[in-house]
Amino acid sequence: MLMPRQNCEVFRQLFVNDTPLMDMRAPIEFAQGAFPTSINHPLMEDEERKAVGTCYKAHGQDAAIALGHQLVNGDIKAARLAQWKAFAEENPNGYLYCFRGGLRSRITQQWLKEAGIDYPMVVGGYKALRRFLIETIDTVAQQPMTIVGGNTGSGKTIMVNELANGIDLEGAANHRGSSFGRYVTAQRTQIDFENVLAVEMLKKQAQGCTHFVFEDEGRAIGSASVPLSINAAMGNADVAIVDDPLDVRIDRLIDDYVVRMQRDYIAQNGEQQGWELFTEYLERGMFGIRKRLGMKRYEELLAAQKQAIATQKSNGTLAEHDNWLRPLLIEYYDPMYTYQLSKKADRIVFRGNYQEVKSWLADK
């Protein structure tokens, strides 16, 4: 039997402790943005919510509530209640929420109570939780930070994940920010990106972090935008530069963009389709920068890429990927980053190889 608990009005520990959350909103609302530990078990499905909303506008709250009870009744109500009971019993430390902590939360609580379960809700609902996370991001933006920069393949993302005070923007966005930046899984929505980012910040704060390290990023990471307050703070922060040799950087890129992506596509889609999707992924990445390469050079590097993939598929060797990655770095990515870095020259406070920069940042 679940012991009665108070409704939740203090949100920090909810996120720091990865507290399970049951989201009562409709699937369309959930898809637009939710929280890392939330599961959608809606009171109403999309069409039901739409019908109730239309009724509310035309006839008022009482009529809308009556329609809601009519739509969610009998077997439908029993099935949803069974889902909620299972969640509550599996997650005795969890909470439920709707958009504002209003009618949907109270009805769910009431039905659960009638079934013998006293389950608490989040006061203020999704809206209050979301506001708290946005405020967290803005608070971190006001704290000391250092940016780790360096040419493509310098291991910046690896480094921020290895540092106790590192914040992985690309991980939060589920995108690596370049033309080749997508993962096998879909990129997060803007809201989900911000929510995941804020939760990571809360956890770092709980560990005592007061100085944060971010990877040098532009405003856009794939289709996501770095929150304005963080982007502005990064634009004024000290910069530490990783200067690693070209061969080391190419090895990292082969591991990240070739070995990992091929493995992940096959794991998700099977051997044949996995190879097809992996090939399409690399070719789309090259296609995305064709105008900057110029069509002649694009076609040459695409041919080298296709040959490297064919050899990899034939005998498992990876060496031929050097034939397109090396010129891509020398001719495109390195000059582009050199130009971007020239605008930050007055903020560079440290340079070194990967281990030197990591050790220096670890003392922050």
Curated annotation (Swiss-Prot):
Domain Rhodanese: 15-138
Active site: C98
Keywords, ordered alphabetically: Selenium, Transferase
Catalytic activity: 5-methylaminomethyl-2-thiouridine(34) in tRNA + selenophosphate + (2E)-geranyl diphosphate + H2O + H(+) = 5-methylaminomethyl-2-selenouridine(34) in tRNA + (2E)-thiogeraniol + phosphate + diphosphate; 5-methylaminomethyl-2-thiouridine(34) in tRNA + (2E)-geranyl diphosphate = 5-methylaminomethyl-S-(2E)-geranyl-thiouridine(34) in tRNA + diphosphate; 5-methylaminomethyl-S-(2E)-geranyl-thiouridine(34) in tRNA + selenophosphate + H(+) = 5-methylaminomethyl-2-(Se-phospho)selenouridine(34) in tRNA + (2E)-thiogeraniol; 5-methylaminomethyl-2-(Se-phospho)selenouridine(34) in tRNA + H2O = 5-methylaminomethyl-2-selenouridine(34) in tRNA + phosphate
Family named by the database record: Belongs to the SelU family.
Function in brief: Involved in the post-transcriptional modification of the uridine at the wobble position (U34) of tRNA(Lys), tRNA(Glu) and tRNA(Gln). Catalyzes the conversion of 2-thiouridine (S2U-RNA) to 2-selenouridine (Se2U-RNA). Acts in a two-step process involving geranylation of 2-thiouridine (S2U) to S-geranyl-2-thiouridine (geS2U) and subsequent selenation of the latter derivative to 2-selenouridine (Se2U) in the tRNA chain.
Name assigned to this protein: tRNA 2-selenouridine synthase
Protein species of origin: Photobacterium profundum (strain SS9)
UniProt lineage: Bacteria, Pseudomonadati, Pseudomonadota, Gammaproteobacteria, Vibrionales
